[in-house]
Every structure is written in C-alpha cells, then in structure tokens.
Amino acid sequence: MRRLVPLAFCATLATPTLLHAQGAPTPLDRRVDSVFAAFDRTSTPGCAVGVDRNGTPLVRRAYGMADLEARTPWTMGTISESGSTAKQFVAAALVLLALDGTLSLDDDVARWVPEVRGIGKRITIRQTLSHTSGLPDRYTLHDVEGRPAGEVDHPNAEVMAIVAKLRDLNFDPGEDYLYSNTGYVVAVAVLERASGKSLQSFTQERIFGPLGMTDTRWREDHRVVVPGRAPAYSGTAATGFRNDHPFTRVHGSGGLLLTIDDFLKWSGAMQRGEGRWGAVRDSLSAVIRLNEGTAITYGLGVTTDTWRGVRRVSHTGSTGGYRAALYRFPDQQVSVALLCNVGSANPGGLATGVATVVLGDALEPVRAEIAPMLAVPPEALAALAGRYHSARTEEVLVLEVRNGHLVDSLGGAVLVPWGGDRFRVRGGTAEFAVTRSATTAQVRVTAPGARATEYTRVEAPVITDAALAAYAGAYRSPELGAPMTFVVRDGALLIDQGWRGTVRLQPLYRDGFRMPGGEILRFTRDARGRITGFVAWAGRVRHLRFDRLTAGAAPR
C-alpha cells in the first residue's frame, strides 16, 4: 500500500542535509549544490551525483532523504534504481556475446526466441537494441490487457507471452525509430538463451565483477530485501509524498540497482576503452540508419549527439519514482552520474545543469534563437489553419491562429515563420514545411535524427447521435484478447471501462477520435461502409487492431 507522509512531519524536517557525512565543499561542489538546491532538505526525497574526469573523482555529493519514514539521508553508498539507463548494460552484454562469436547482432531474433515467429517478419538483435524493431511497447500492451504497470506485478515471462501473441508490428523492422521496452525484454531472452545464463549471472561475471561494481545487481524480484536501497516516492512537499516503488519483476529494459560510484566505474571503463571495452563502447555508439537512410541519434542503449559543441553519450531513466542519468563527454573525459528517488526530479535537466557547471568554457555559448523578421499576412495564416492527419503514425495536428501566430493546439507548439512556407517550433528544432495544391494542403515535419512525417489536411467530422451510434458496441483485440466497449451518452462517444469509469473521446476526423491522453482510435469499415473494428495508436504502440463483436445500444 502506498502511504502518504504527513505534511506536519515534513515541516519538522525542513533543514539542509548536506552536512551528512560530506567533507568541506569545494567551489565546484558549491556550484553543483546550486543545481540540486530543491532537494537539499530533510523534508524531501533526494539525489546523489558524481562527476569524474580522466578517472579522477571531481564531485561526490548527496542531497535530501533516501528514506522519509526511517529518516535516513542520501549518501554516496545509497543504492537506487537505474530506469532505462540499464539498457546499455544489456546491449553491452550482447556485444560481448557477439565478440565471443556466440551470436551476431544481425542474427534473426527468431533463432533464439521462437516466440516472435508469429509476427512473420525478420527482426534482428541490433534492431531490438536500437528501438527500430517495430515491437510495440509493453506498458501500453499491459494497459490494453487491463493489467497496467504499477497495479500488477509482471515478470519478464509475461512480456514474452504477450510477444508470442503478436501478429503485427508498429512498422516493418528498420523502417522507423520508436522507443520500445518490449525490445529489451526480448533482448534479455536472447542473451539468456544464447549464453545459458541468467542476465544477473552473465553481467555479474562479465561486467559487474571485472569492473568492481560490488553494489550492482538486477531487480529480478522487487520483493527481495536490498540493504541500503532508497525507497521511491512521487508527489511534492506541498502535496505530500507517496511511496512509488516499481511493482514489477521486469528487468533488462530497466531495473538495475546500483550506487553512484558503480555507475561511474562503468562510465570510466567506456571512457578508457581498454581491452574489449573499446569494442563495446564503439558498438554502443555506432550510427544506426533506418532502411531509407536516415541516421538516428540512438545507438545500442545510448544516445550519441552534440550538445553546445561537445560530443555527448547519454541516457536517462525513470521507473516508478526513481530517476537516473548517465552522461559521458568523450573528448573532455568527463562523466556525470546521478540517481534520485522522487518522480518530480528531471534527470536530464539535472545532468545538463551539472555538465554546464563542470565543462564551463568547453561549451559553446547559448545563443538566443533569432527568427527571421518575417510577417505572414493574417489571411495566409488562416488559410493554413485546420486539421492534418499522418497516415503513417496516425497523429493529428490541429493548427489554429492565436494572437497572430500559428499554433499546434494539441501539442502546444508555437510555430515561427522561417521563410517561404516554412515554420519552426519556437524554442525547438522541428521544422514544419507546408505544400499546397488546388484541392488540399500537406505539412511535412522534420527534426534532427528523426524520420520526416507527412500530414495531409482532413475535414472536421460532422457529429450526430446517429453517426456516433454506428461506433457503439463491443470490440476485442485478436492478439491480446482484450475487450473494449463504446457507448454514446449526451452526444459523445465514450469508452465504458466498468468500475474504472468512462473515457470521453474527442472527434478529430471521419472515423478518427482522440482519447484524453493523446491516444488515437480510427474505426475501420467494410466495402458497404459498416464498422468492422478499429485500430489504436497509443504513443509507442501503433495500429493495434480490435475487431467488432457486437453493435451497441441506442444513444442515451
């Protein structure tokens, strides 16, 4: 049961905690402390951060409370959870197996995991590690099955059982990039079957042990007592904190328990690249290209990009209330590692703040975005307003004119004129290019390291009770066996979730609806125009098919 920490208790503890087992701060320490000022309290969960340069510790700081109930502060010995920063360890383990000659990263996954054969498409190990496999993400699949993460304890075997039922992918392998935790659970299965050892045994023998990572282990079972582990929390000091422990046995996509020092031992091995670690490092950061040639920034378990003029290899992580980040700057030989035990912590923002302090003059100055001084006539902006639909991702743009600017009302982005029929997202790098014909308009959205997405203008639907009644009824996913029921009430289409209540759908275009969380449902019809089912696009899951079982009742 999650428990609320009373505010009165928190108020009695509102004092800084940096004096806990930490030496006199250096000037660099004080600048790093400013990044974590919000966590420097005995009333809040906290963080630990470490920075190394050329293998030499520069910073070791801890803030806030590791355990609010036991009133235990964070220290450098506190064990926390990695979130998705764990993925690089699974990728490294498979690279080691490839170096051994046991397998190839370009092997068909089905060689080791026959559960994927029902999909009928060749997926390589490399594609599972680079999120280009097309495998739908497990979190959404659990939700659809009515067994959501956080409420149900899932083991890796359950994820593999779902994979065995899949008959389609988000896209053909290699055609696109879409983050998938499922891919890493499949990768763990490949590793364990190819090596004959558990993930824990293999990584202990080949990675943790050799690198002296004595406080590192996989969270194979969340029920196991781990001395020195910080519990995880959600909430804020204003609302109170609740326990937010990962209630799951899934590991490999996340679920690595470790300390800051162990994190940095791993990063140091990647920096030095001695022996086989050089080949591992280079494999993780090698450029991945989609089938049509686009280079993506994600490699195998890490992202490699350029930030303010310096090369950066990084990953962040979040599971439950745990947050983590590991940033490595190869040319400066600097590593930044952080672990936090509260969901409000922004690991990427914190790691970037620390890197800004540590790298200093090595960074290019932050230049203010200077948009071209272009004025677009109001009538020209009004002509672009409307709804645009991507057949590839099923995403929808709703462009509106607000205060003289073109705005994506669903995504919240403000579009700045950039010359011709081009616009750029204010404060971002995505570019919108508009093309028009006599009958329609299209928007092409591009961003660095991503495949372009084309959207075509669609008309807003005409909504009547009779039109909505055509969608009402019961549906089921043939892959997951999950039911879904639609009803019409008060002039709206709703998903009836029984005791969980109802979800109101927003009409977007003919047969297309949006759920409050952004998920898109598109109903399908036969040659006679009758509703036969629908397909769902939900973030990291695309075109999940549901077949119609029964028609619904009349509106009420």
Where are the regions that the model predicts?
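Short, conserved catalytic-motif segment at the N-terminal edge
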Residues: 25-82, 102-107, 111, 161-168, ...
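Bacterial N-terminal signal peptides
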Residues: 6-17
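Boundary at the C-terminal end of the N-terminal hydrophobic targeting segment
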Residues: 19-23
